[in-house]
Amino acid sequence: MAMPDSRLRSGIALANLRAMPTLAIVFGLILEAMGIGAYFLSGAQSVTALIPSFFGSVILLSGVVGLLIPKARMHVMHVAALVGLLGTLGGLGMGLPKISGLIAGTLERPTAVIMQIAMGVVCLVFLALCVKSFVDARILKKYSK
């Protein structure tokens, strides 16, 4: 497999380095908004409604640090990916088993289940983008030698 010329490679590498911290900030803000929205819209105002915000805060902070401190970018993006993995497992792991009750309308707190599934899906998309970025970075590193 031949890689494009070095100018294109360096452009791709530069775009890749800037893209993941920016995506982390965007996904962090989405999770923050989900948690705050669930907290105020659910009526119960339980601290557990803020769980997406907790995940979002770590991902958002990782993105900001990744942009501001280039030498730490790889490490903080791996932290963000780990948080994305935990959010995926927690959100989908807790929400999907309750989906039949959600469809049947028998759940006591349907908003909580919807938010669990939504958080899991958002974290899954973020995690997939992280994995793609890590693979792209490894390929670029391999061909830049």
Which residues does each PLM region occupy?
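Residues within membrane-spanning alpha-helices of integral membrane proteins
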Residues: 21, 25-28, 49, 56, ...
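Cytosolic juxtamembrane helix at the C-terminal end of the final transmembrane segment
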Residues: 130-145
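Mid-chain, well-packed structural core segment of small domains
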Residues: 71-106
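Individual transmembrane alpha-helices with interfacial aromatic-anchor signatures
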Residues: 107-128, 132
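Transmembrane alpha-helix entry/boundary detector in multi-pass membrane proteins
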Residues: 17-23, 27, 34-57
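Cytosolic juxtamembrane helix and N-cap/initiation of the first transmembrane helix
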Residues: 2-28
